[in-house]
From Swiss-Prot:
GO (cellular component) term, any one: cytoplasm
Record keywords, A-Z: Cytoplasm, GTPase activation, Lysosome, Membrane, Phosphoprotein, Tumor suppressor, Ubl conjugation
A Pfam family annotated for this UniProt entry: Rap_GAP
Comp. bias regions, Low complexity: 1078-1097, 1448-1463
Record-listed Phosphoserine modification sites: 540, 664, 939, 981, 1130, 1132, 1155, 1339-1340, 1348, 1365, 1388, 1412, 1419, 1421, 1455, 1772, 1805-1806
Subunit (UniProt): Component of the TSC-TBC complex (also named Rhebulator complex), composed of 2 molecules of TSC1, 2 molecules of TSC2 and 1 molecule of TBC1D7. Probably forms a complex composed of chaperones HSP90 and HSP70, co-chaperones STIP1/HOP, CDC37, PPP5C, PTGES3/p23, TSC1 and client protein TSC2. Probably forms a complex composed of chaperones HSP90 and HSP70, co-chaperones CDC37, PPP5C, TSC1 and client protein TSC2, CDK4, AKT, RAF1 and NR3C1; this complex does not contain co-chaperones STIP1/HOP and PTGES3/p23.
GO BP terms in the entry: anoikis; B cell proliferation; cell population proliferation; cell projection organization; cellular response to insulin stimulus; cellular response to starvation; D-glucose import; excitatory chemical synaptic transmission
Keyword Metal-binding part of the UniProt annotation: no
Protein name in UniProt: Tuberin
């Protein structure tokens, strides 16, 4: 509209030019400067005139055209030219002539236009008045040139509009329209009168033409009219119709919309909208779809389009009705455009739409949906439903302001056409009205279920309806459960099993499960019926199904899995709710379904998954003693049901056991008494599940399922109530398990196995179940028991060998009758197992367990014993195995050697020696001379002598041991496969790793090196003690703790004592001087002894000792006077243990009590006789004359070794020299008569003399020195009751025989064994003295009758029978003993030895003769550096083996190890060699004769020299060393404080009900349950503390005066003692609020036993004990007299050492005392050892030693001290070190070897078989 203004300005310029007021418009053609005028000559004119021909004229016109375009013509030349050619325009002229003239006019106008003036009007007139309508194009070209394409109309203004209108009628072309556009733009004011006609004609052209170019140009004209002129109102309808139609042309959409937008922007905008609405509503246009579509488009775009006109104020509400009317006649195009338009409206202006607008929109949408029923247009259908979706999204966003009900009615009406999401929203909307506040809500729910569930095929919609139903049930089921289940659930979901959609079936089943879980009415059965129908579907794949479709088919069976898992959940809930019949039915349904699996052989993965989860749940069922069923919660706590039982009360619980079974099942706990009607109780017989489990074991093909069942069965079998209260056949279970292992096709039927699956994996899974079944052995047939053992034996060749060994160890305890037959073969099979770290602990602990079960191996022959040593010896290799394994191996070797039958032991010594050399010693050999020791094997390839020699002919009393050969060559070959040697490269490569494998903490390099060296020394010391142990026990079973007999006390009291250090032994010789005789006679011993007889007051001594291992056991022992009583606390490890005279420099007191230290002296302190108890003077005078006759020539030899002490009491029978003035020794018989006479005299005189000489003194206090004279102690003294028989025998203390309790009439023993008397006195036990009827005598070779008799002895000790031999033709007397009732565990204990223990030593025999003057003394090389000696007497002569030290000459024959054994006789033969000797004259003459030497009697040196002297001892280290002073005697006393047996202390605590987390309550318990009491009884023997002597019974620090209670339990075997710190037996003091008195004992024990009777889990850390408590052994009582053993270890504890006990899970053992004692004590022994090894790692420089090692180290330290003392006293003597036997090259610049290195080399090179010279 701004263009007319510019035109007005143009007119003003023109007027100015006309008036001369302005400048004319510059002619662009003159821009280049003034052109040269062209002159039209006459000739040119003549050529143009008619005179010339037409062709010449046309030619000349063409030339003039060129000139006119480019040059300026002279003035009036144009007129002349026009006049010359004007005649050619006549109509009759040819077209060429006319065209040439029009072309000339065009050229003149273009070239001379600015000079034409009025000629322009002339030329325009020529064109306008052209005679014909021809030549339109040329005329238009002249017009375009004349007006400059419509821009300049000077001199043409008046007639221009008429000419344009006239031209439009004749030639309305696009070219003209383009000129017209400029005319309208630049000269619109001259066209006003005719504009309406022009618009009309152009609109008609647009409507009629088909040329898009014409339409486009016409639109340009119309646009120019709208923009530069005013469109007439009368032209508006036609204009709009034209545009509405034109908009349908795709190419013209943009210009049409632009034109309409321009129109709507004018004052005619609202009129245009109105006209378009009228068009949409006009019925005459209902069929004109393009027109309606254009109108809809323009209205929508103008009002709410992307480029809407904000000047238009029409609201959507005003135009949408027109849209609705436009849809009166269904038309796809119009409807499509309407949908687009209102979609655009809704999306852009949704927030501004009012409710009335939404109503109209919903009307339009409804009509659209109706039209879709008739219009087959997918595009329209899609866009309409997209519109609905858009509205739906607004509803979701709360931006829909219309009627939601109206909208969802539309959606529901066309639900089948709506997408799932829309229906889901619809269902959600409908669900809002389903609640009790709405009338008819149940009917609405029914309609919803019927409409969208029963008749809906889309899963999502049906699932949504199920969600609505589930939500309704969840919210209001408690009020309307009855109506909902009746009216909706059952009616609508009963078809679920037949539904084709597996997802719907699955969710519907889950809904039924959820509903049934909380349903407690009769409707539960209806719901369960539907669930069972779902479960009844077959899980077998169709036969034609391909493998790739199995996954799809399995997915279609998910509803079955849901049903089964749902039943598991229902059962878990129903188990604890009423009615209990629901749980019973669910349980039966589950079992029935699983049975179908095995009946039809379902093998699909989903079927396996169902079985997997079903078994996973069902195997969690538990039962308590009241037969109530329960399940563990997520924390593992089992909650038992008050309504569901595992059996019926009327069920006969004993009916399960068949007649062929060994036992009937135990009665078990009492049945629960029903608290209500029987209908309230449900019965879930476990036998149903048990039968399914058997089917699983026999038929299951999926390995995951089978593995789960096998892993869960051991824990289920723990609850015996489940098994015994219903007919569950454990025989069948055992048979099924054994069949799995033996059947070759078991692996073939398994699938889903991991890669590399083999029979080993099957064994690994089955063996734990077999282990758990061991506790059911009383209910298994013997055949099944044998099958189990056989399967376990077969598993030894697989990776499960360790588990099998564990199980076999339990079988040994639980099933001795079965294992005893298989044991010989089993032991041989164990030798086939390679010695690996993984098998070390199981094998060694199995052997350790077996060693404590002598009744199992009482029939062992040498082959079996050799197998045991072949198994154990490789594990002594420190380069391969850790410290615990090595220590345990030495422990096993020692136990088995001691338990081995006596005749076999000698043959095993070289075998064990070579094994130790190969496995231990060579590991530390760093010398180049190793060729002699590179023995490939010390296994049974080089078997013991007893296995190599031929079997000797059987004789009655043969001295040769009964040795057997292998009966089969295959057995011999089996032994050859085991090698216990280590090759040189293995040693070199692994020694360093092994030595440093123990965790030494954060120590520096020096401490690490020290720890490594200590570890090396430890292994060498273990070897030394092992060899020393063999030397001690190879020919005898005497205990390691001798006790001086009353005769010895009498003879040796106040005697002279000297001690020599010989190798690693201390030899103490004590000779008699007559003090005992004078004391007997009432004489004053001070006459002979002077001041040396003084005895120190024990109360003045306070001693605190530390023994090895110097750990927790080191406690301060003090004697504190408290009023009238003395409180004595036992020292750890038996500090009060006295072996020999503690201070040998002080003679004995008359009462036989020397100064023994505070504790032992108090215990042995004799009562002082009353003052009036004096002998008559006459008798004293008469008997005094015979004092020298009674005591001369007696001597005691006490040998202290690392493994124990040995004592002999001997008499010198050499007559005195005729030149001597001394009187000969009194014969023993006369001495006995004198003693008996003195005894009778004292009885008549009523004098309580305190010297014990009567063998019947049962009430006498035990003697002070606990020595047992093992060879020649005359303890069986003559009494009148002995019928005058006198014999010489072994000490009663060491004859391991006791009276049999319960048969007092069979035998009577005249003399109580002193050691037994001492032990019984220490324990405070009552004894029965019985008299034997007969005496027996036998040689070392036992007869068959004796064998059979000894094999009947009670288990618990090594059967030993000691033969008694007399001189010459002395009549033989038989001494027989009857077996006894077992009282305790083991036979030959160092201190704690019971009657049964002593009895057990009857098995093997050895002849011991008295020492005669003709005794031959032979000496050979020793065991350990020539320092070990074995004393034995065979036949009728006594041989004393003395091992001197030092190297041998090269001329001697060499031993197998490259060194020649030394052998020479001291008394009869010349020395075999001469060796270098270091003179020590200064030392020998260090002192003059002392006062002790003036004491009458034989000098101890005389006795020592007769036994040990040799002219050639070799080097200095082999020479005996006399202890120089009293300080060293004190060291000997300290050695006596170290017991020769290992000691352990173990805590025992009782946890009652509700005490599992209360430390104070646990410690405050003063008693426990009856089962707890039975358990304590099985731990060991009850002892009374006040009657115990701490030096004889290890108490672990318990006070004997009542501070720590009155009683406790103790246990022992051959080489160890254990005491139990029992919290309930300790006093609970009110003043001790925190129970510190108890914790000071319990907190310092490595291992604690927790008897957990609380019914809850006991957690480690509940008892806040000290840092030393590593392991808890938790005993949980189970039903049917069974206990559960579990281990709890600290994170830093020795769990790894004892882990094999936990491999099968947990151990279930019978609560029988014998079984519990064996199981628990063996386990505790191993745990203690592992704990001690672990604890030593906290101090790497203090490696754990046994008591034997501690004694060995003490002796070695004593040797070093003596050498240092000698060197200090005699500086001229060199400091002696034991030299190495191997000579290093002289040129090698090596450092001087240390003492340890030299000792190590000497030990390696000198370990020989001492049995070669014995």
């Amino acid at each position: 509209m701004a263009k007319p203004t510019s035109k007005d300005s143009g007119l003003k310029e023109k007027f100015k030019i006309l008036l001369g007021l302005g400048t004319s418009r510059p002619n662009p053609r003159c821009a280049e400067g003034k052109q040269t005028e062209f002159i039209i000559t006459s000739e040119i004119l003549r050529e143009l005139s008619g005179e010339c021909g037409l062709n010449n004229r046309i030619r000349m016109i063409g030339q003039i055209c060129d000139v006119a375009k480019t040059k300026k013509l002279e003035e009036h030349a144009v007129e002349a030219l026009w006049k010359a050619v004007s005649d050619l325009l006549q109509p009759e002229r040819p077209p060429e002539a006319r065209h040439a003239v029009l072309t000339l006019l065009k050229a003149i106008v273009q070239g001379q236009g600015d000079r034409l003036g009025v000629l322009r009007a002339l030329f325009f007139k020529v064109i306008k008045d052209y005679p014909s309508n021809e030549d339109l194009h040329e005329r238009l070209e002249v017009f375009k040139a004349l007006t400059d394409n419509g821009r300049h109309i000077t001199y043409l203004e008046e007639e221009l509009a008429e000419f344009v209108l006239q031209w439009m009628d004749v030639g309305l072309s696009s070219e003209f329209l383009l000129v017209l556009v400029n005319l309208v733009k630049f000269n619109s004011c001259y066209l006003d009168e005719y504009i309406a006609s022009m618009v009309h004609m152009i609109c008609l052209l647009c409507i009629r033409t088909v040329s898009s170019v014409d339409i486009e140009v016409s639109l340009q004209v119309l646009d120019a009219v709208v923009c530069y002129n005013c469109l007439p109102a009368e032209s508006l309808p036609l204009f709009i119709i034209t545009l509405c139609r034109t908009i349908n042309v795709k190419e013209l959409c943009e210009p049409c919309w632009k034109l309409m937008r321009n129109l709507l922007g004018t004052h005619l905008g609202h009129s245009a909208i109105y006209n378009m609405c009228r068009i949409m509503e006009d019925r005459s246009y209902m069929e004109d779809a393009p027109l309606l579509r254009g109108a809809v488009f323009f209205v929508g775009m103008a009002l709410w389009g992307a480029h809407r006109l904000y000047s238009l104020k029409n609201s959507p509400t005003s135009v949408l009705p027109s849209f609705y009317e436009a849809m009166t006649c269904p038309n796809e195009v119009v409807s499509y455009e309407i949908v687009l338009s209102i979609t655009r409206l809704i999306k852009k202006y949704r927030k501004e739409l009012q409710a009335v607008t939404w109503d109209i929109l919903l009307d339009i949408i409804e009509r659209l949906l109706q039209q879709l029923q008739n219009l087959d247009s997918p595009e329209l259908k899609t866009i309409v439903h997209d519109l609905l979706t858009t509205v739906e999204e607004l509803c979701d966003q709360n931006e829909f302001h219309g009627s939601q009900e109206r909208y969802y009615e539309l959606v529901e009406s066309y639900a089948d056409q709506r997408p799932e999401s829309s229906l889901l929203n619809l269902i959600s909307y409908r669900a809002q009205s389903i609640h009790p506040a709405k009338d008819g809500w149940i009917q609405n729910l029914q309609l919803l279920m019927e409409r969208f569930f029963r008749n809906e095929c889309r899963s999502a919609v049906a699932i949504k309806v199920l969600d609505v139903l589930s939500f309704v049930l969840l919210i209001i089921r408690q009020f309307y459960e009855e109506e909902l289940i009746n009216s909706v659930v059952i009616s609508q979901l009963s078809h679920i099993p037949e539904d084709k959609d597996h997802q719907v079936r699955k969710l519907a089943t889950q809904l039924l499960v959820d509903l049934a879980e909380g349903c407690h009415t009769h409707h539960f059965n209806s719901l369960l019926d539907i669930i069972e129908k779902v479960m009844a579907r077959s899980l077998s794949p169709p036969p034609e199904l391909e493998e790739r479709d199995l996954a799809v088919h399995s997915a279609s069976l998910e509803d079955v899995k849901t049903a089964v898992l749902g039943l598991l959940v229902i059962l878990q809930t129903k188990l604890y709710t009423l009615p209990a019949s629901h749980a019973t039915r669910v349980y039966e349904s589950l079992i029935s379904h699983i049975q179908l699996h095995y009946k039809h052989g379902y093998s699909l993965p989903i079927a396996s998954s169902i079985r997997l989860q079903a078994f996973d749940f069902l195997l969690l069922l538990r039962a308590d003693s009241l037969h109530r069923l329960g399940l563990p919660n997520k924390d593992g706590v089992v909650r038992f049901s008050p309504y569901c039982l595992c059996d019926c009360m009327e069920l006969d619980r004993a009916s399960e056991k068949k007649a062929s079974g060994p036992l009937s099942p135990p009665t078990g706990p009492p049945s629960p008494v029903p608290m209500g009607p029987a209908v309230r109780l449900g019965y879930l017989p476990y036998s149903l599940l048990f039968r399914v489990l058997l089917q699983c074991l026999k038929q299951e093909s999926d390995w995951k399922v089978l593995k789960l069942v096998l892993s869960r069965l051991p824990e289920s079998l723990r609850y015996k109530v489940l098994i015994f209260t219903s007919p569950c056949s454990v025989d069948q279970l055992s048979s099924a398990l054994c069949s799995m292992l033996s059947a070759p096709k078991t692996l073939e039927r398994l699938r889903g196995t991991p890669e590399g699956f083999s029979r080993t994996d099957l064994h690994l899974a089955v063996v734990p179940v077999l282990t758990a079944l061991i506790s059911y052995h009383n209910y298994l047939d013997k055949t099944r028991q044998r099958e189990m053992v056989y399967c376990l034996e077969q598993g030894l060749i697989y990776r499960c060998a360790s588990q099998c060994v564990v199980a076999l160890a339990i079988c040994s305890v639980e099933m001795p009758d079965i294992i005893i037959k298989a044991l010989p073969v089993l032991v041989v099979k164990l030798t086939h197992i390679s010695a690996t770290a993984s098998m070390a602990i199981p094998l060694l602990e199995f052997l350790s367990t077996l060693a404590r079960l002598p009744h199992l191996y009482r029939n062992f022959v040498p082959e079996q014993y050799a197998s045991v040593f072949a198994i154990s010896l490789p594990y002594t290799n420190p380069s391969k195995f850790n410290q615990y394994i090595v220590c345990l191996a030495h422990h096993v070797i020692a136990m088995w050697f001691i338990r081995c039958r006596l005749p076999f032991r000698k043959d095993f010594v070289p075998y064990i020696t070579k094994g130790l050399r190969s496995n231990v010693l060579l590991s530390f050999d760093d010398t180049p001379e190793k060729d002699s020791f590179r023995a490939r094997s010390t296994s049974l390839n080089e078997r013991p002598k007893s296995l190599r020699i031929a079997r000797a002919p059987k004789q009655g009393l043969n001295n040769s041991p009964p040795v057997k050969e292998f009966k089969e060559s295959c057995a011999a070959e089996a032994f050859r496969c085991r090698s216990i040697s280590v090759s040189e490269h293995v040693v070199r490569s692994r020694i360093q790793t092994s030595l440093t494998s123990a965790s030494l903490g954060s120590a520096d390099e020096n401490s690490m090196a020290q720890a490594d060296d200590n570890l090396k020394n430890l292994h060498l010391e273990l070897t030394e003690t092992c060899l020393d142990m063999m030397a001690r026990y190879v020919f005898s079973n005497f205990t390691a703790v001798p006790k001086r007999s009353p005769v010895g006390e009498f003879l040796l009291a106040g005697g002279r004592t000297k001690t020599w250090l010989v190798g690693n032994k201390l030899v103490t010789v004590t000779t008699s001087v007559g003090t005992g005789t004078r004391s007997l006679l009432g004489l004053d011993s001070g006459d002979l002894q002077g001041g040396s007889d003084s005895s120190s007051d024990p109360s003045t001594h306070v001693r605190q000792t530390k023994e090895a291992p110097a750990k927790l056991e080191s406690q301060a022992g003090q004697q504190v006077s408290r009023g009238a009583r003395d409180r004595v606390r036992s020292m750890s490890g038996g500090h009060g243990l006295r072996v020999g005279v503690l201070d040998t420099s002080a003679p004995y007191s008359p009462g036989g009590s020397a100064s023994l230290g505070p504790q032992t002296a108090v215990a042995a302190k004799p009562e002082k006789p009353p003052a009036g108890a004096q002998l008559p003077t006459a008798e004293k005078t008469n008997l005094a004359a015979y004092v020298p006759l009674l005591t001369q020539g007696w001597a005691e030899i006490l040998v202290r070794r690392p493994t124990g002490n040995t004592s002999w009491l001997m008499s010198l029978e050499n007559p005195l020299s005729p030149f001597s003035s001394d009187i000969n020794n009194m014969p023993l018989q006369e001495l006995s008569n004198a003693l008996m006479a003195a005894e009778r005299f004292k009885e008549h005189g009523h004098a309580p003399v305190q010297v014990i000489v009567s063998a019947t003194g049962c009430t006498a206090k035990p003697p002070t020195l606990p020595r047992s004279n093992t060879v020649a102690s005359f303890s069986s003294l003559y009494q009148p009751s002995c019928q005058g028989q006198l014999h010489r025998s072994v000490s009663w203390a060491d004859s391991a025989m006791v009276l049999e309790e319960g048969s007092p009439g069979e035998t009577q023993v005249p003399v109580e064994p002193p050691e037994l008397e001492d032990f019984e006195a220490a324990l405070g036990t009552d004894r029965h003295c019985q008299r034997p009827d007969t005496y027996s005598r036998s040689s070392s070779a036992s007869s068959q009758e004796e064998k059979s008799h000894l094999e009947e002895l009670a288990a618990g000790g090594i059967p030993i029978e000691r033969a008694i031999s007399s001189e010459g033709a002395r009549p033989a007397v038989d001494l027989s003993f009857q077996p006894s009732q077992p009282l305790s565990k083991s036979s030959s204990s160092p201190e704690l030895q019971t009657l049964q223990d002593i009895l057990g030593d009857l098995g093997d025999k050895i002849d011991i003769g008295r020492l005669s003057p003709e005794a031959k003394v032979r000496s050979q090389s020793g065991i350990l550096d020539g320092e070990a000696a074995t004393w034995s007497a065979t036949g009728e002569e006594s041989r004393i083996t003395v091992p001197p030290e030092g190297p041998l000459p090269s001329s001697s024959p060499r031993s197998p190890s490259g060194l020649r054994p030394r052998g020479y006789t001291i008394s009869d033969s010349a020395p075999s060699r001469r060796g270098k000797r270091v003179e020590r004259d200064n030392f020998k003459s260090r002192a003059a004769a002392s006062s002790a030497e003036k004491v009458p009697g034989i000098n101890p040196s005389f006795v020592f020299l007769q036994l040990y002297h040799s002219p050639f001892f070799g080097d200095e280290s082999n020479k005996p060393i006399l202890l120089p002073n009293e300080s060293f005697e004190r060291s000997v006393q300290l050695l006596d404080q170290i017991p020769s047996y290992d000691t352990h202390k173990i805590a025992v605590l009782y946890v009652g009900e509700g005490q599992s987390s209360s430390e104070l309550a646990i410690l405050s318990n003063e008693h426990g349950s009856y089962r707890y009491t039975e358990f304590l009884t099985g731990l060991g023997r009850l002892i009374e503390l006040k009657d115990c002597q701490p030096d004889k019974v290890y108490l672990g620090g318990l006070d004997v005066c009542g501070e720590d209670g009155q009683f406790t339990y103790c246990w022992h075997d051959d080489i160890m003692q254990a005491v139990f710190h029992i919290a309930t037996l300790m006093p609970t003091k009110d003043v001790d609020k925190h129970r510190c008195d108890k914790k000071r004992h319990l907190g310092n024990d490595f291992v604690s036993i927790i008897y957990n009777d609380s019914g809850e889990d006991f957690k480690l850390g509940t008892i806040k004990q000290g840092q030393f408590n590593f392991v808890h052994v938790i005993i949980t009582p189970l039903d049917y007299k069974c206990n559960l053993l579990t281990l709890q270890c600290r994170k830093d504890g020795p769990a790894c050492k004892c882990e094999w006990w936990r491999q099968p899970g947990e151990i279930v053992v019978w609560a029988l005392p014998v079984v519990m004692e064996l199981t628990v004590t063996i386990l505790l022994c191993h745990l203690q050892m592992a704990s001690q090894v672990h604890h030593s790692r906290s101090n790497p420089t203090d490696i754990y030693p046994s008591k034997w090692i501690a004694r060995l180290r003490h002796i070695k330290r004593l040797r070093q001290r003596i050498r240092e003392e000698v060197h200090y006293s005699n500086p001229s003597l060199p400091l002696m070190h034991p030299p190495a036997h191997t000579k290093a090259p002289a040129q090698a610049p090596e450092a001087t070897p240390t003492y340890e290195t030299g000792q190590r080399k000497r030990l390696i090179s000198s370990v020989d078989d001492f049995t070669e010279f014995v």
